[in-house]
């Protein structure tokens, strides 16, 4: 059996891994991951914007010092900041979520939260890769993302409906907050 690697397959695998991880860690930790992801989104865009501004204003000094800050460097810094912020907040952020364990209901909620987390992470990665501000309508026309969207119906759907995918986890958190409260 020959499997062809496509963007759709990668997206499906990404969703499967994140959903599986959410089922393993459970509802409470999944909520922490979503919260950390929203905070990391803001931090990433803030730090990335500051670095872009600094590199534009100080490009002569930076070049003299032998420091090259190009778009690839900024992209790498943004991805690193995004990942590190999520990990730090989820592990050390002081966020305490404690819902009553309700068995199958909690498992179902963890799966739904996993799906929402995967969507949020992916839409954030698309935004960072496109080097755009958050929820920028130009996301559908940026060359790197346009290429992916042309090759993948799933990516095109996520990019086209970025506002939905970005708000979905928050809406799910609100809806599920009434289930299993202590």
Where are the model-predicted features located?
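Alpha-helical transmembrane segments and their juxtamembrane interface "caps"
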Residues: 1-182
């Amino acid at each position: 059996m020959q499997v062809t690697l496509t963007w759709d397959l990668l997206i499906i695998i990404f969703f499967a891994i994140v959903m599986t991880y959410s089922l393993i860690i459970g509802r409470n930790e999944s909520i922490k991951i979503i919260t950390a992801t929203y905070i990391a989104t803001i931090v990433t865009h803030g730090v990335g914007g500051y670095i872009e501004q600094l590199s534009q204003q100080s490009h002569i000094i930076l070049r003299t010092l032998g420091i090259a800050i190009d778009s690839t460097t900024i992209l790498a810094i943004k991805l690193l900041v995004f990942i590190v912020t999520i990990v730090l907040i989820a592990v050390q952020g002081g966020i305490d979520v404690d819902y009553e364990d309700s068995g199958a209901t909690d498992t179902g909620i963890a799966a739904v939260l996993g799906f929402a987390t995967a969507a949020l992470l992916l839409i954030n990665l698309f935004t960072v890769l496109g080097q755009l501000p958050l929820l920028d309508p130009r996301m559908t026309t940026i060359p790197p993302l346009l290429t992916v969207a042309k090759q993948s119906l799933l990516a095109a759907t996520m990019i086209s409906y970025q506002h939905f995918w970005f708000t979905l986890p928050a809406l799910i958190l609100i809806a599920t907050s009434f289930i299993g409260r202590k």
